[in-house]
């Protein structure tokens, strides 16, 4: 059933990409080839688990095709879906090679004797590699990396053909073995071409700290009355894990610095004791990891990975709602860590007692430790945050500009930094200094008055729909043409900038879209306003109309 569903999805995806007005970019021959290497493993709890034979295929699917697959999949399944791609080197893809690749892409199985022959790059699908003309440079930025929370491993450079001819084939890591088999003679102990080999389970290192962002430290965190309690608690936890507050539960509106504090805990704790095993994950990453472990029958490895830790930090714990299996596993993980006197740090956009969609036994455990809330910073703190931002980005700005922005944008740090970035982008596009004149021009009619202005998602959608001469239902729908998709992405961006709504809440306002769709739109438009004058002007004009609108 899964294979049939996946075939329908890929066929629809390719068909949509050929339509002139489609939002989905043209899918190249190379990308079609990678699509045919994909094998569906499971569709569970709103996540499609896909298997590919090597890391280059994983990178292509996630980076260039992920959002398009998510869109088609969600529409077909009748609920929001995300995609989790995993590398499975044991996949037998030889018998299922794509048939729509030009004949000149076929590569012989033997190594030619010509000394200057260069074998196919091991990053490409077996037996063929695209010519330069196959790259879709027109849409190279359409689906930027990072649209979802997956970690993509960059493929290692391939060995030269000369080395391949001079040295016998040796055992390689799983992600490279298949490609190497196409380029060099096989030793007698290696499996025959196309034969399924026994799965070699990759080792997982629970000590790995690659999930921690080194930029998020206590040194770069601006402390004020609005965040002093969670900051003090976080510092104490980092200095003495499991001896101060366990669990530590940090909550507050989106964009106030919860994630920064969690990374700071991990970075400082490992600075004090490099032997500590620290892991930071979002609730979505935890869910994906759990689903993959069930699929691969590797639950014991999963348990070791999350229970053999000194500090476990899970961000946005509220997103475990509706995932009963994941909640069950997290409950047991929580108990195991707490009984072993290991530190647990959680974050959410609301206090534990308001997490009514989670099981009672989880909420009561969250309430057993210290609950620390963060609220919007005061004026002096907002100015300090902007000074730090300007210094970190190497941007020179007059202090009165920072005071102007800080005095008018007080809902969240994200909104504050967004206004600063907008001024910086305007100055960059116009090659102007960042002074009061530039700031006032960039933010003309956009800054709220001293009195609070209530801006809602409905107001933003109404103004955007009118601006682009479409109705609100069309804007909220699933239309893929640029005339509809672009306004929708602009509206999602403005909802993120001008309201305190979380990503899932914004998605609900747009017809139940998944939060990853909102995240993709926010990043895409945020990138475009620094590169495309048309997009920048649209955001300016829409914001002006929204803030001067009397709509309810």
Curated annotation (Swiss-Prot):
Chief subcellular location: cytoplasm
Gene Ontology MF terms: ATP binding; ATP hydrolysis activity; DNA replication origin binding; lipid binding
Annotated region described as Domain IV, binds dsDNA, given as residue ranges: 428-552
One Gene Ontology term from the biological process aspect of the record: regulation of DNA replication
UniProt region (Disordered), positions on chain: 113-213
One of the Pfam families matching this protein, by short name: Bac_DnaA_C
Low complexity bias: start-end ranges: 155-170
Region (Domain II): 90-210
GO cellular component term, pick one: cytoplasm
Domain of life the protein comes from: Bacteria
Keywords, alphabetical: ATP-binding, Cytoplasm, DNA replication, DNA-binding, Lipid-binding, Nucleotide-binding
SMART domains hit by this protein: AAA (SM00382), Bac_DnaA_C (SM00760)
Cited PROSITE patterns: DNAA (PS01008)
Annotated ATP binding sites: 255, 257-259
Classification via InterPro entries: AAA+_ATPase (IPR003593), Chromosome_initiator_DnaA (IPR001957), Chromosome_initiator_DnaA-like (IPR020591), Chromosome_initiator_DnaA_CS (IPR018312), DnaA_C (IPR013159), DnaA_dom (IPR013317), P-loop_NTPase (IPR027417), Trp_repressor/repl_initiator (IPR010921)
Region Domain I, interacts with DnaA modulators, residue ranges: 1-90
Region (Domain III, AAA+ region): 211-427
UniProt comment concerning the protein's domains: Domain I is involved in oligomerization and binding regulators, domain II is flexibile and of varying length in different bacteria, domain III forms the AAA+ region, while domain IV binds dsDNA.
Subunit (UniProt): Oligomerizes as a right-handed, spiral filament on DNA at oriC.
NCBIfam families per the UniProt record, alphabetical: DnaA, PRK14086.1
Function of the protein: Plays an essential role in the initiation and regulation of chromosomal replication. ATP-DnaA binds to the origin of replication (oriC) to initiate formation of the DNA replication initiation complex once per cell cycle. Binds the DnaA box (a 9 base pair repeat at the origin) and separates the double-stranded (ds)DNA. Forms a right-handed helical filament on oriC DNA; dsDNA binds to the exterior of the filament while single-stranded (ss)DNA is stabiized in the filament's interior.
Family as reported in the entry's similarity comment: Belongs to the DnaA family.
Name of the protein: Chromosomal replication initiator protein DnaA
């Amino acid at each position: 059933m899964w294979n049939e569903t996946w075939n329908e999805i890929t066929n629809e995806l390719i068909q949509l990409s050929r339509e002139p007005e489609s939002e989905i970019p043209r899918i190249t021959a190379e990308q079609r080839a990678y699509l045919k290497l994909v094998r569906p493993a499971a569709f569970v709890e709103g996540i499609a688990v896909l298997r590919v034979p090597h890391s280059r295929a994983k990178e292509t699917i996630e980076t260039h095709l992920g959002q398009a697959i998510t869109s088609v999949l969600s529409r077909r399944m009748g609920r929001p879906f995300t995609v989790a791609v995993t590398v499975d080197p044991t996949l037998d893809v030889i018998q299922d090679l794509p048939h729509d690749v030009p004949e000149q892409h076929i590569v012989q199985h033997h190594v030619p004797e010509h000394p200057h022959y260069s074998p196919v790059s091991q990053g490409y699908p077996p037996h063929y590699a695209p010519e330069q003309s196959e790259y879709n440079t027109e849409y190279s930025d359409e689906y930027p990396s990072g649209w979802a929370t997956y970690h993509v491993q960059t493929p290692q450079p391939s060995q030269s053909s000369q080395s391949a001819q001079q040295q016998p084939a040796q055992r390689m890591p799983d992600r490279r073995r298949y490609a190497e088999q196409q380029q060099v003679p096989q030793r007698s102990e290696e499996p025959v071409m196309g034969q399924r080999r026994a799965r070699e389970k990759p080792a997982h290192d629970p000590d790995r700290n690659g999930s921690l962002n080194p930029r998020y430290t206590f040194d770069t965190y601006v402390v004020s009355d609005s965040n002093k309690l969670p900051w003090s608690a976080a510092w104490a936890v980092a200095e003495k894990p499991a001896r101060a507050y366990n669990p530590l539960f940090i909550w507050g509106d989106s964009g106030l610095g919860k994630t920064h504090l969690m990374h700071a805990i991990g970075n400082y704790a490992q600075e004090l004791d490099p032997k500590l095993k620290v892991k930071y994950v979002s609730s979505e990453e935890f869910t994906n990891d759990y689903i993959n472990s069930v699929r691969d029958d590797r639950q014991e490895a999963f348990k070791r990975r999350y229970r053999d830790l000194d500090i476990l930090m899970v961000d946005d714990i509220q997103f475990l709602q509706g995932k009963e299996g994941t909640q069950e596993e997290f409950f047991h993980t929580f108990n195991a860590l707490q009984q072993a006197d290991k530190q647990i740090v959680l974050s959410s956009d609301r206090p534990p007692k308001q997490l009514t969609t989670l099981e009672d036994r989880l909420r009561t455990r969250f309430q057993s430790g210290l609950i620390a809330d963060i609220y919007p910073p005061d004026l002096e703190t907002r100015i300090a945050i902007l000074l730090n931002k300007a210094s970190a980005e190497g941007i020179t700005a007059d202090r009165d500009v920072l005071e102007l922005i800080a005095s008018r944008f007080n809902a969240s740090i994200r909104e504050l930094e967004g206004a600063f970035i907008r001024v910086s982008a305007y100055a960059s596009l116009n090659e102007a200094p960042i002074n009061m004149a530039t700031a006032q021009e960039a933010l003309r009619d956009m800054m709220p008055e001293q009195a609070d202005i209530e801006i809602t998602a409905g107001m933003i959608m109404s103004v955007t729909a009118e601006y682009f001469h479409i109705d609100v239902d069309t804007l909220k729908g699933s239309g893929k043409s640029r005339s509809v998709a672009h306004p929708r992405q602009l509206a999602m961006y403005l909802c993120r900038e001008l309201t305190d709504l979380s990503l899932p809440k914004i998605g609900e306002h747009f017809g139940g879209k998944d939060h990853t769709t909102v995240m993709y739109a926010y990043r895409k438009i945020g990138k475009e306003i620094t590169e495309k004058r048309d997009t920048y002007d649209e955001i300016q004009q829409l914001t002006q109309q929204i803030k001067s609108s009397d709509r309810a």
